[in-house]
Amino acid sequence: MRSRRAPTIVDAALTLGAHHAVAMPTRRGYVPAMGETSLMTAEELLRLNLPDKRTELIRGRLVVRDPGGARHGAVAMQLGYRIMAHAEAHDLGRVYAAETGFKLESDPDTVRAPDVAFIAKHRVPEVEPRGYAGWAPDLAVEVLAHDDHPAETLEKIAQWLKAGVRLVWVVDSEQRTARVYRADGSEALLGTNETLDGEDVLPGFRCPLADLW
């Protein structure tokens, strides 16, 4: 496992995002430029009806994407199942499925949806809202799709960490690797023969990357 200290990832990525005011067409969707349309709130996003689409909000800007591909879905499901089985067996907390929205910022609003999320038991509310979660998960898992842009992925990781996520896993099924990002700014690159470790966020959890492919 190759580790290095990366204390500036959050600031660098958020600075990139703050100056990214031009429209960004992608194969999956379209991010309108600032000023091209009025900013949307989390409440408006929740009421939006776009069947068979994946939506997020980035500082008030709507992102609309098509569903992920088969490999993306299979890897996300495989890892999510393993996380849920471990969390339930050890009464560690709650696991959330793909596309569960978490409101990370307000005025303008940011709503992100990871492929898998975990929240420690002591942080799970007695009554969960029907709308977006108003808190950040402890673990956020992102499974890269073939059209994910590196700069957009970096910005998303930075937003997770800034919001209080303690551990982020970014799984690349094409390269058969995973990157681990921690709240202290450190990160690690794992090869296909290495193992994801839940560390102190998901104690006792270990998943060989090779089992996901």
Where are these regions (language model features)?
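Catalytic toxin/effector domains delivered as secreted proteins or via bacterial secretion systems
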Residues: M1
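Gly/Pro/Ser/Thr-rich low-complexity, intrinsically disordered segments predominantly at protein N-termini
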Residues: T8-W213
